[in-house]
Amino acid sequence: MITTEIKRVKNHINGEWVESTGTEVEAVPNPATGKIIAYVPLSPKEDVERAVEAAKNAYETWSKVPVPNRSRMLYKYLQLLQENKDELSKIITLENGKTLKDASGEVQRGIEAVELATSAPNLMMGQALPNIAGGIDGSIWRYPLGVVAGITPFNFPMMIPLWMFPLAIACGNTFVLKTSERTPLLAERLVELFYEAGFPKGVLNLVQGGKEVVNSILENKEIQAVSFVGSEPVARYVYETGTKYGKRVQALAGAKNHAIVMPDCNLEKTVQGVIGSAFGSSGERCMACSVVAVLDEIADEFIDALVSETRKLKVGDGFHEENYVGPLIRESHKERVIGYINSGVADGASLLVDGRQIKEDVEGGYFVGATIFDGVNQNMKIWQDEIFAPVLSIVRVRDLEEGIQLTNQSKFANGAVIYTSSGKHAQTFRDHIDAGMIGVNVNVPAPMAFFAFAGNKASFYGDLGTNGKDGVQFYTRKKVVTERWF
């Protein structure tokens, strides 16, 4: 329940809310106002060790619970999440800043991830082949790993944790969760509802904190696997450190997603699609459109329409329905984004819409409005770097081939989109673009939870993505049995 009092956030270990054993805390502001809404502990290594011990003890019994029984408990959790959708959305808007509409969409995507986890009995089924040789049968069996952990970012405080712990727990593992210290309140509510669903103590443990918690998770010998979503430098660090300590790691990293706009596109729908992808959730998502490669033939018409519609977008508190662009997560990130806008201007890009100039009264909040650059090239930092904000770069290209070449020059390869009415163009794009997730006239090509989610190149470190069959394979180990009976 949302209140006006400043909350002191706790850890949840072995089925109980407990104070951190450390003394260091960090203030959690509402990004729309700058006012403090909570204090979160920066937990020390000892808290992680307690959580891991609780998870290890719980694993001894939880791993023996029949798979259908685990699934039934997740159905109860799913029901509770659905019953509390409005409250969960409001918590997200309060501590993350995204609009209620965007928050509600995130809640729904999180619920869909739990729906996937409830199907664990089907997803965990192995394989068998009788009589592979004279009187010999072969089969593959899947078993849980043990204690696993998840490290999640601020930008999707509900959806991304729900990619991780429900599926891991459905597979028979126990879990240690470290969510972003910037959005601790939603994590608390997810854990409360989890135990309200009747799960045994210690199956899910929550440790709040920063880098010390991350390092403690990566170095703890009892943790068998780590799931991570965050920025590229940290993802690389998590992958390299976790694997050094013998862990299975999936680390989803940064992005610089491109959209190619063809002359045969539906112009009106393309403009609205690019706006939604680039400026929704204030651009703070790894699937946001950051660059549009528009063909010369339609460039002026597309850009005129895009700029006209973008200037209509209102900036402000996400609780107010009329606002489209909410705040960025922190003042420091706002200053970083303004630095990128200044860089684009200095490098010679044409600033068509300036998000530094906000006409609405947003005093106290961390706001940058929708921003559009034209005349961008590959030598500019605004093309090269992940800005993680409502900043869109436009590059004019001669044809589809040049658009694909431009996109593939990025070190990132998370998502890519083409807007076209040509099946041939779509097939060429699909076959030659280097991206893990591809959209054809789909604004944000993030797949549903029953498909795997992962990028390529510097957007992903690991072998198995989150969700779908990849997720089940990540959270289980297989045993291949060859047997003969006399």
Curated annotation (Swiss-Prot):
Pfam families, per database record: Aldedh
Keywords: NAD, Oxidoreductase
E.C. code: 1.2.1.27
Catalytic residues identified in the record: 286
Associated pathway: Polyol metabolism; myo-inositol degradation into acetyl-CoA; acetyl-CoA from myo-inositol: step 7/7
Reaction(s) catalysed (UniProt annotation): 3-oxopropanoate + NAD(+) + CoA + H2O = hydrogencarbonate + acetyl-CoA + NADH + H(+); 2-methyl-3-oxopropanoate + NAD(+) + CoA + H2O = propanoyl-CoA + hydrogencarbonate + NADH + H(+)
SUPFAM superfamilies in UniProt: ALDH-like
GO molecular function: malonate-semialdehyde dehydrogenase (acetylating) activity; methylmalonate-semialdehyde dehydrogenase (acylating, NAD) activity
Binding site for NAD(+): 154, 178, 181-182, 231, 386
Any Gene Ontology biological process: inositol catabolic process
Statement: the UniProt record of this protein carries the keyword Oxidoreductase: yes
Subunit structure: Homotetramer.
Similarity comment: family membership: Belongs to the aldehyde dehydrogenase family. IolA subfamily.
General function of this protein: Catalyzes the oxidation of malonate semialdehyde (MSA) and methylmalonate semialdehyde (MMSA) into acetyl-CoA and propanoyl-CoA, respectively. Is involved in a myo-inositol catabolic pathway. Bicarbonate, and not CO2, is the end-product of the enzymatic reaction.
PANTHER family, sorted: MALONATE-SEMIALDEHYDE DEHYDROGENASE
Protein name stated in the entry: Malonate-semialdehyde dehydrogenase
Originating species: Bacillus cytotoxicus (strain DSM 22905 / CIP 110041 / 391-98 / NVH 391-98)
